[in-house]
Structure formats: C-alpha cells, structure tokens
Design a protein with these regions (language model features):
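Hydrophobic alpha-helical bundle architecture
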Residues: 36-40
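Membrane-proximal N-terminal amphipathic helix
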Residues: 42-68
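Short glycine- and Lys/Arg-enriched binding-loop motifs that mark or flank ligand-binding interfaces
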Residues: 7, 21-24, 48
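Conserved Walker
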Residues: 13, 30, 45
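N-terminal leader/signal peptides at the extreme start of proteins
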Residues: 1-12
C-alpha cells in the first residue's frame, strides 16, 4: 500500500501571481480614462436635459395661462396648485425663482443665477461653469442653445 506524504504543498507560483497583477494593472489603466469621460458626458446630458425641461415648462405655463382666459393675470396656478409668476399678456414665466424656478419645480443639481432676469443661467453644481450651462430669457421665454464645450 502506498502512503501519501503530508508535506506536499500546492498553490500559485510567484510568476503566476505577477502575471495576474500585471494583467489587472493593464485593464485598470485602459478602463480609467473611460470612467473619467463618463462624468463629462453626464454633465453634458444634464445640461441638455434641463434645456428640454425649460422649454417644456415655458410651453406648459403659457398653455395654462391662455386656457385660463385672463390675459391680464400676472400669475398662473398650475395643476398641483403651485403658482408661477408670468408676464401679463404673454404668460411667459418671469426670469425669477417665482417664475421659471417655480415652473421647473426643482432645480436640484444646478446652480441657478437669477441676477439678470433676461439671462437666468443654469449650471451643474458639480463641474459647471460658463462653458457648461444653459440660459433662459425671462422677457421672451426663449431658452438659449446649451453651452457644453467646457463640461
């Protein structure tokens, strides 16, 4: 009868472990730039998303304004009972927090500058600047083309 030795050891050799570490390092080095680019793409998508939301909000407020039939009114009560400040005669949301800010209902994730009512800017709070924003004109109701060159 053959006896087995209890001194035999099994495992990975040092060369095998080094090869695995090198392969993992190469994979990590090629994947990292792709993840960095994703955050830029996310900011661009978020600016484009708020652009669409602004245009929709203006249209909805104006539709509700004209449906109410009072073209002298300076506020519009929306379906959820929120009040939006508008320009009398046109129903365009004002370039204020009580105007376009209330029409959007949420500006979470954006720094909004209401300093100039004719150029209200929406910038992502995480990495937004002058080259990563969209502007709203409270006098005309127009939403400018988004600027995404610096997101």
């Amino acid at each position: 009868m053959k006896q087995f030795s209890s001194n035999t050891q099994s495992g990975f050799t040092l060369v095998e472990l080094i090869v695995v570490i090198v392969v993992l390092g190469i994979l990590a080095a090629t994947a990292l730039p792709k993840f960095i680019n994703v955050s830029t793409e996310a900011r661009v998508a978020s600016v484009n998303g708020v652009t669409g939301a602004l245009r929709s909000a203006v249209s909805l407020v104006q539709a509700k304004y004209y449906a109410a039939g009072n073209t002298a009114a300076t506020t519009v009560t929306m379906q959820d009972n929120s009040t939006v400040t508008v320009a009398a005669g046109t129903g365009i949301p004002a370039g204020t927090a009580a105007g376009i800010g209330a029409a959007l209902q949420s500006t979470e994730g954006f720094a909004v500058d209401y300093t100039t009512a004719t150029a209200v800017t929406f910038r992502p709070t995480n990495g937004g600047g002058a080259n990563c924003q969209v502007a709203y004109d409270g006098s005309t109701g127009l939403v400018a083309q988004p600027v995404t060159s610096g997101c």
